[in-house]
Each structure stands twice: as C-alpha cells, then as structure tokens.
Curated annotation (Swiss-Prot):
HAMAP family: EF_Tu_B. Residues 19-26 are annotated as: G1. Keywords: Cytoplasm, Elongation factor, GTP-binding, Hydrolase, Magnesium, Metal-binding, Nucleotide-binding, Protein biosynthesis. It comes from Ureaplasma urealyticum serovar 10 (strain ATCC 33699 / Western). Residues 136-139 are annotated as: G4. Mg(2+) binds at T26. This is Elongation factor Tu. InterPro entries: EF-Tu_GTP-bd, EF-Tu_GTPase, EFTu-like_2, EFTU_2, G_TR_CS, P-loop_NTPase, Small_GTP-bd, T_Tr_GTP-bd_dom.
Length: 394
C-alpha cells in the first residue's frame, strides 16, 4: 500500500516533556494528543501508546524517548517524551539534543525534586532555548498557596540555570483529568499549547549546509531493507541521494531508497525533521545508534581532537575536585557516548571546576566530528563539563 504523503504546510518544531519521574510527563503527552485530536490536529494516543516498550509499561517508566506528532493552528510539532528516570539521563541527553523547546512537568503535590533540577540543568547544557512549565496534578493538590510556592520555587530554579524564570509561562493543570475528557482541565491543555506556540521560538534551520542526520535507532522493514531514524541536523536529503554512514566503524557508502516522517512518505527531508531513512544494501548489524548519515565526504571520523572545554562548578552540578591528565570520562557527541582520555597542555597540572581549558582528547572509538562539534562530558551519572572541538587530527 502506498504511504500517505507528508504535506509540509506549517513550520516544524521539535519539543519534549522533561521532569522528575512519575510527575506525569507521559500522561501529559497523551493528554496533549487526545485534546488536539478533538480538533483534528493529532491522532489521540493513550498513555500506553506513548509508553511504548513492554519493559517501560511494566515499570511504568519511559526509557527510550518516544515521538508523538501533533499540530496547533500555527505549527507542526514532533513531541519527544523524555525519560525521567536517573538511569536514563543518557537517553534524555540524546532526546534533549533534538529539542527546540521543552515542557517541564512538575507535580504540584511534590514540587521541585532532584531530577527536576537535573533536567533543567541538562536542558541548559544541551542548548534548549526556552522552557514552558506545566504544574501538574492541580486536581489533587488544590491548595492555591501550595501551588504558588511550587511556582515560585521553579521560577527561581529556572533563573538560577540561565532561563528567563520571571517571564516563563507556568500553566496549572491536570494531565490525567484532561486525558479523561474533563472540559475544565482540557482548557488548560489549550492554554499550555498557546504558551508553547508563543514562548518557544521558531528555530533557524541550516538547510544550506551539507546533509547530516545523527542516527538514533536502526530497524529492519521486511522486504524493504534497513531504516535508520534520527533528527536531520542540517542540510536536505532526497530519495536516490548517495550518503555515507560515518563513525564507530569503517565508513560505508549507500543510497537512500525512501524517506518517511511519522509513517508518511517524504520527497525531501530537511534540517529539523525527525525522519526514517531507508538504505539500500545495508544490513541492520552494519549500522548502529551513534553513527551519522551524511553527504559523502562532508565529515570524517576522528579519534583524537583538541577542544575548548568548560569544567562545571560544583554549584552547576559538576565535580567537587580538579581533573588531571589521564582522566577518562564519557564524551557525548549527538546520539553517541564514547570513553576518552584527556591530556592537558604542557605546564597545566590540573583543572579546577569552573575553569576553561584547552585539552587534547583521545577516544577509544572514532566519532564523526569536525571543528565546532559540541559535546558534553559525563562521569558517574552526572555532567562534568562541555566543550567544542577546535581541531581534529587523525
């Protein structure tokens, strides 16, 4: 059966829900799709639809970021429901790296929790420009004074991490009641989406640069071949274009035989799209998450590079102690994390939290990087620094 075609009539924005586990992110995602479906702007998704993998449903926790599509009057959104459990911060990083804006979900009954802080910090570190706050479970925590207190606390926290805490929209609602069809709470979802439309800026897309998609997932469609999915970081791609798969393994060349977005076929994928790309003659085991799909010759894999790095202060969620040459943390580039050893410049014995430093890094596996590539450095479940590549060497 021929797939329906994706019609590009509204600007496309990538957005996501972040926040502490069990504060209601997945329920809110389901509620948004269900409320918008009544206006013909989405396909209603239940909690179980959003919470896709069986392992997630058993634990009631979202692990791999899952995508939902919907529209408002002015925009087309891809909504990623970000994992909220501490073990899955890694997924949050790759999910958040794709977000043009975020909805921070906070249960009015609990207030700000450890992961609330961590997610705001991560959103800042991966460059999410604006956050809208949804104060959830207000049907349960009905005391307006308590709601005011939580709102005040979250505004202070947003300001502390470099967001505009004073002006950020804070919507008070109940994802569960909206999902159940209560009109009072459904109106709060409309209010939330109006805030998202107006507060989260339309991203500038680099469509004129060479094509690059960071591979997030790989699967096989029987009879058709291997599909890679991910967000197009830059450039455009058409069916029959040649592409290279770069990083982690030897570079491979292939041809694009199909492009899809939200189960609809696409003539052209462009920067900002969350697309599935069908590849000719590639087996599922030949390609993996963390590689990139690129215009041939536009980017090379490197194991060694020099970078300008900022080491986070303790107050920013970073280390309490200095780092020295030989330190081996994980380096997060797009959808991959690779261990690397650092070498500090001659004459520099150690780097204190809060310092900027130029360092050389040797990764244990080659990654597709170029001058200007951004990365985070993590160790033991927390971000300890971030930086950008200033020079690559083979």
């Amino acid at each position: 059966m021929a797939k329906a075609k994706f019609e590009r009539t509204k600007p496309h924005v990538n957005i996501g829900t972040i926040g502490h586990v069990d504060h209601g992110k997945t329920t809110l995602t389901a509620a948004i799709s269900t409320v918008l479906a009544k206006k013909g702007q989405a396909i209603a998704q239940s909690y179980a639809d959003v919470d896709k993998t069986p392992e997630e449903r058993e634990r009631g926790i979202t692990i791999n970021a899952s995508h939902v599509e919907y529209e408002t009057k002015t925009r087309h959104y891809a909504h990623v429901d970000c994992p909220g459990h501490a073990d899955y911060v890694k997924n949050m990083i790759t999910g958040a790296a794709q977000m043009d804006g975020a909805i921070l979900v906070i249960a009015a009954s609990d207030g700000v929790m450890a992961q609330t802080k961590e997610h705001i910090l991560l959103a800042r570190q991966v460059g999410v420009p604006k956050i809208v706050v949804f104060l959830n479970k207000c049907d349960f925590m009905t005391d307006p004074d308590m709601q005011d207190l939580v709102e005040m606390e979250v505004r202070e926290l947003l300001t502390k991490y470099g967001f505009d805490g004073d002006n950020t929209p804070v919507i008070r609602g109940s994802g569960l009641k909206a999902l159940e069809g209560d009109p009072v709470w459904e109106a709060k979802i409309d209010e939330l989406m109006d805030a998202v439309d107006s507060w989260i800026p339309l991203p500038e897309r680099s469509t004129d640069k060479p094509f690059l998609l960071a591979i997030e997932d790989v699967f096989t469609i029987s009879g058709r071949g291997t599909v890679v999915t991910g967000r197009v970081e830059r450039g455009t791609l058409k069916v029959n274009d040649e592409v290279e798969i770069v990083g982690l393994k030897d570079t491979q060349k292939t041809v694009v035989t199909g492009i899809e977005m939200f189960r609809k076929s696409l003539d052209q994928a462009e920067a900002g799209d969350n697309a599935g790309i069908l590849l000719r003659g590639i087996k599922k085991e030949d390609v993996e998450r963390g590689q990139v799909l690129v215009k041939p010759g536009s980017i090379k894999p490197h194991r060694t590079f020099t970078a300008k790095v900022y080491i986070l202060k303790k107050e920013e969620g970073g280390r309490h102690t200095p780092i020295v040459s030989g330190y081996r943390p994980q380096f997060y580039f797009r959808t991959t994390d690779v261990t690397g050893a650092i070498s500090l410049p001659a004459g520099v014995d150690l780097v204190m939290p809060g310092d900027d430093v130029e360092m050389t890094v040797e990764l244990i596996a080659p990654v597709a990087i170029e001058d200007g590539s951004k990365f985070s450095i993590r160790e033991g479940g927390k971000t300890v620094g971030h930086g950008s590549v200033i020079k690559t060497s083979n």
